[in-house]
């Protein structure tokens, strides 16, 4: 392909990512190899032109386009200067250090040394190979697609790949079935038949002439990490464990404060974000924090966050979000999503990101603590409920389950609100979930039931033959308990495919870089070395993190039901979003889309609007699916 045509196509792809990098743009082509690399820059480190990309290594062998941060780049630079003084590192960016590290150590040995979040493409001019690399936990996204007529395209978002005329928009219906179950598409699937996600902790190697065959190399294996941690368990007591966790987190936060632009933090008032902010205030007296407050009492964490901020001495900003503000954001969310994604908490995450971006360019987030340290209700209550249910004959469990599922969810919600005795949001949904759990036939079945939005997605997605697995690993770690098996599944699937995807898309939509210190890979390894009792005990999760935070804040501030940025989607779909819902999921519109069974959708709408069941998760999944399909012209 002529260099001009090749470059023109990559330019169109590059501009689809302008929101991810508004500060600069670059293009590099190798016409002989038919390879072009494009980049949009969000300037964080070395704001000069020395940090511009694509960037070439000191040897001239490698060219890179890089998204993310190598937080320990200063230490690596010093080490390189000591062992390879002849290797010149241009400028002060972590990208330049990355390239020098690959020059000196090779890719795999360099990756072992990196502490960070990253997705990058590395072109080897000598071997004529392209390597696509994604960080250990999947914090940064990276996609690859086969193109009609030959060749491949890659990008941080599928929207950029879709700008290439050779991209096929055919739906992967098996992946869509899994999406309806989990509200996100499990890696490596994407929702498109010809596109994949690069899996966390791996890199793909593609060779010329057509780069069509990709070989996957695992450089960070979560199974090996967990098994290795269990082989060398932490031997100290809970106080010693809390001190070691604090040491690791303190260094993780310190590294993530390195920036040439202003840095702040999201603060919901919960354990995770409060821990991050507390450690930030030890490193700086000038910490800015951001939260949103809601008109809905059940979802308003504004006062809680403000109390934490006051005690920690941060410069705190609260955005009080009206119903109109949030509903307006609903209309903008589909343009941020390049694959089906149904986690409605992306709406408040986008709103708090928008507010933060007016003051800072980088924000630290508390995401990841739940998956590592047993913070979800399923980790705390799931094993207990399973053991208790096994003492009851199956026929009796099924009978009780049917009775619970007949209770109208909306009625339970209203009664709970009037009595004020429920410490959980949406008690009707929780009662119905309990009814479904009583039908579970195994511990694994219970976990799937806890995560499922649509319980029988193969009956809903037209043409789907089987669901793709939530985690396609060839083997599982030798885990000691039901709770730990759920935590592992959450770490390798729910965390990258849902939580981190949400944070990346919501923050990058407004050109804000979000950093997640709780899932530094050193913290991950330590967390898995801890005995379960330090994570979950006496129906309380994240015990070790509570102990750590208790040294800084009064227990009453965080010893309460789980908080976070949320919205009353169930009520909105019956109220101000009712017409939007009916329009998006009108039977004729669903039928014309050709992806799902119209009657199944209509029945779900009826159950929710009548108040017989709380189906807001399932319905929002379906709205997001149709918005995605219409935006990309999916068939």
Residue ranges and their predicted role:
Residues 331-335, 357, 379-381, 572-574:
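Short low-complexity, flexible loop/linker segments enriched in glycine and/or proline
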Residues 263-272, 296-297, 344-347, 372, ...:
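Glycine-rich loop motifs involved in handling phospho/adenylate chemistry
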Residues 351-411, 494, 499, 503-523:
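Active-site adenylate/phosphate-handling loop in enzymes that bind or generate adenylated species
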Residues 79, 164, 372-375, 526:
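Residues that scaffold the ATP/ADP-binding catalytic core of kinase and kinase-like folds
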Residues 11-15, 31, 87, 162-163, ...:
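Adenosyl-5′-phosphate
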Residues 384-433, 438, 596, 623:
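Membrane-proximal basic amphipathic "stem/tether" segments
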């Amino acid at each position: 392909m002529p260099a001009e045509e090749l470059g023109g196509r990559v330019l169109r792809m590059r501009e689809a990512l302008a929101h991810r990098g508004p500060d600069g743009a670059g293009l590099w082509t190798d016409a002989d190899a038919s390879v072009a690399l494009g980049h949009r820059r969000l300037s964080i480190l070395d704001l000069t032109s020395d940090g511009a990309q694509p960037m070439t290594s000191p040897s001239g062998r490698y060219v890179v386009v890089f998204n993310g941060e190598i937080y320990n780049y200063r230490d690596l630079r010093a080490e390189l200067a000591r062992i390879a003084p002849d290797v010149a590192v241009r400028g002060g960016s972590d990208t330049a250090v990355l390239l020098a590290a690959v020059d000196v150590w090779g890719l795999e040995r360099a990756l072992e040394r990196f502490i960070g979040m990253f997705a990058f493409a590395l072109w080897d001019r000598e071997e004529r190979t392209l390597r696509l690399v994604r960080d250990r936990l999947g914090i940064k996204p990276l996609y690859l697609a086969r193109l009609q007529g030959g060749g491949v395209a890659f990008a941080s978002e599928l929207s950029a790949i879709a700008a290439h005329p050779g991209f096929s928009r055919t739906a992967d219906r098996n992946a869509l079935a899994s999406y309806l179950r989990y509200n996100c598409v499990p890696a490596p699937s994407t929702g498109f038949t010809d596109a994949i996600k690069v899996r966390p902790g791996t890199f793909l190697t593609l060779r010329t002439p057509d780069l069509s065959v990709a070989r996957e190399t695992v450089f960070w294996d979560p199974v090996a990490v967990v098994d290795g941690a269990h082989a060398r368990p932490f031997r100290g007591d809970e106080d010693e464990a809390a001190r070691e966790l604090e040491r690791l987190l303190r260094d993780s936060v310190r590294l993530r404060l390195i920036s040439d632009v202003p840095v702040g933090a999201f603060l919901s008032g919960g354990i995770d974000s409060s821990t991050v902010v507390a450690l930030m205030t030890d490193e700086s007296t000038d910490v800015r924090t951001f939260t949103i407050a809601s008109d809905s009492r059940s979802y308003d964490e504004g006062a809680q966050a403000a109390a934490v901020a006051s005690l920690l001495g941060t410069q705190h900003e609260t955005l009080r979000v009206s119903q109109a503000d949030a509903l307006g954001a609903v209309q903008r969310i589909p343009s941020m999503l390049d694959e089906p994604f149904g986690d409605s908490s992306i709406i408040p995450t986008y709103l708090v990101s928008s507010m933060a971006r007016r003051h800072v360019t980088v924000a630290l987030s508390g995401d990841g603590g739940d998956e590592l340290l047993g913070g979800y209700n399923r980790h705390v209550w799931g094993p207990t409920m399973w053991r208790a249910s096994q003492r009851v004959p199956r026929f009796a469990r099924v009978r009780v389950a049917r009775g619970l599922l007949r209770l109208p969810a909306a009625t339970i919600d209203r009664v709970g609100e009037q009595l004020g005795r429920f410490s959980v949001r949406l008690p009707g949904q929780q009662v119905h979930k309990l009814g479904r759990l009583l039908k579970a036939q195994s511990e694994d079945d219970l976990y799937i039931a806890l995560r499922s939005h649509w319980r029988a997605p193969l009956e809903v997605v037209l043409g789907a033959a089987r669901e793709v697995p939530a985690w396609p690993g060839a083997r599982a770690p030798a885990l000691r308990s039901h709770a730990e098996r759920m935590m592992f599944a959450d770490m390798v699937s729910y965390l990258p495919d849902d939580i981190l995807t949400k944070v990346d898309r919501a923050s990058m939509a407004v050109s804000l870089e979000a950093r997640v210190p709780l899932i530094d890979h050193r913290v991950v390894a330590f967390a898995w070395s801890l005995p379960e009792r330090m994570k979950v005990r006496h129906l309380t999760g994240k015990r070790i993190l509570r102990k750590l935070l208790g040294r800084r804040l009064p227990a009453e501030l965080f010893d309460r039901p789980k908080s976070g940025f949320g919205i009353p989607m169930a009520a909105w779909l019956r109220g101000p979003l009712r017409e939007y819902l009916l329009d998006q999921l009108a039977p004729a519109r669903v039928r014309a889309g050709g992806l799902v069974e119209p009657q199944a959708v209509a029945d779900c709408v009826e159950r929710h609007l009548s108040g017989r069941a709380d189906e807001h998760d399932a319905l929002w999944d379906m709205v997001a699916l149709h918005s995605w399909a219409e935006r990309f012209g999916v068939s």
